[in-house]
Amino acid sequence: MLTDYSVLISESYDGQHKLLTEELKRNGTKVHICGDTEIELEIGAVKYTPDVIVIDCCKLGYKKLLHFREILHEDDIHPIIYNIYTYDDTETIRILLDYDDILHILMPYDAKNVCHYMLDKLKRIPVDPDILRQNIS
């Protein structure tokens, strides 16, 4: 399955980002890597014009993430965040989960499922989010 989609992944995306990168490339998606600061993400968004940006919400920070989300929303870029449950504040988690345009990845995850979830979301195909809860054994 070849796609015309482009994904930007923050380089702080620990461990499994290589599996996700391989799976996305296998499906014909262009994958770019950038730094994990707000300015590096903004530069990557302008330089590569991705359809999706994968972000560690804890590295970027809650307030910067919400500000960055507004910038991405204007450019029709879909943010995908992970490590959301490492926040101690349940109110912060609740607020982040309430945004419909932010996709969430639970850790650990199956790279193949996340890849297909991302591509289906880009194609506007309804997907059961429970697929992301399947852990690698």
Regions found by a protein language model. Give the residues of each.
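His-Asp phosphorelay/catalytic-motif detector in bacterial-type signaling
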Residues: 4, 49, 74-82
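Acidic, metal-coordinating helix/loop segments flanking the phosphotransfer/catalytic sites
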Residues: 35-52, 60
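C-terminal output helix
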Residues: 91, 109-118
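CheY-like receiver
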Residues: 125-137
